[in-house]
Amino acid sequence: MKFAVLVFPGSNCDRDMYNAAIKSGAQADYVDYRETSLDGYDGVLIPGGFSFGDYLRSGAMASVAPIINEVKRLANDGKPVLGVCNGFQILTEIGLLPGALLHNDSHLFISRNENLKIANNQTPFTNLYGENEIVVYPVAHGEGHYYCTDDIYNELVENNQIILTYEDNPNGSHENIAGIVNKAGNVCGMMPHPERALEKILGTDSGVKLFEAMVNSWREQNV
């Protein structure tokens, strides 16, 4: 399996994403936002950071980058797409995931480890975790409040699209939502950082299973 790790001006988690892909047994390349083809890639990783300085709003300017049409194409083809933090914001901006990310209720930047519950372990991103397993991922964001209308929330619940919830909501996210998938289950966005949770020496290795799950799920379908 070969991942494209997207790089925008202001990305700062691209190396972490690359490392996570390699550690999970996949191949990976950094792909500049000005590229117009993702031919040859089996999945996309959209990292955190502050793409284009978060001007206008988080993810807004990245949403019109040349590479985005290819991200949409791969997503529509059923290939896995993971967006973390700013990557999640970008996925909502381009319409691959519902809802929006607002400023934290505290209006402060939050950076700490958070306990999270695996709310759905039947996706290509979470199928190596136990049902309702508690994991620890770092968060680092100022605009991590997940917002959606009641109709969208009811749809997320009905379709089992909520995959990750906060045990102690740090930002005011609707119903403690930390991560979701699209209806097809191949596009995932989350504010916490699994790519920063790969080594026990750093405090948690809870993120390892997420990337291994992506690779294993792809191999089951393609090898």
Swiss-Prot record:
Gene Ontology cellular-component annotations: cytoplasm
Pathway of action: Purine metabolism; IMP biosynthesis via de novo pathway; 5-amino-1-(5-phospho-D-ribosyl)imidazole from N(2)-formyl-N(1)-(5-phospho-D-ribosyl)glycinamide: step 1/2
Organism of origin: Staphylococcus haemolyticus (strain JCSC1435)
InterPro entries: Class_I_gatase-like (IPR029062), PRibForGlyAmidine_synth_PurQ (IPR010075)
Record-annotated active site: C85, H193, E195
Chief localization: cytoplasm
Name the record gives this protein: Phosphoribosylformylglycinamidine synthase subunit PurQ
EC number(s) on file: 6.3.5.3, 3.5.1.2
HAMAP family from the UniProt entry: PurQ
Biological function: Part of the phosphoribosylformylglycinamidine synthase complex involved in the purines biosynthetic pathway. Catalyzes the ATP-dependent conversion of formylglycinamide ribonucleotide (FGAR) and glutamine to yield formylglycinamidine ribonucleotide (FGAM) and glutamate. The FGAM synthase complex is composed of three subunits. PurQ produces an ammonia molecule by converting glutamine to glutamate. PurL transfers the ammonia molecule to FGAR to form FGAM in an ATP-dependent manner.
Subunit structure comment from the entry: Part of the FGAM synthase complex composed of 1 PurL, 1 PurQ and 2 PurS subunits.
Annotated keywords: ATP-binding, Cytoplasm, Glutamine amidotransferase, Hydrolase, Ligase, Nucleotide-binding, Purine biosynthesis
Positions of the Glutamine amidotransferase type-1 domain: 3-223
Coiled-coil zones: none
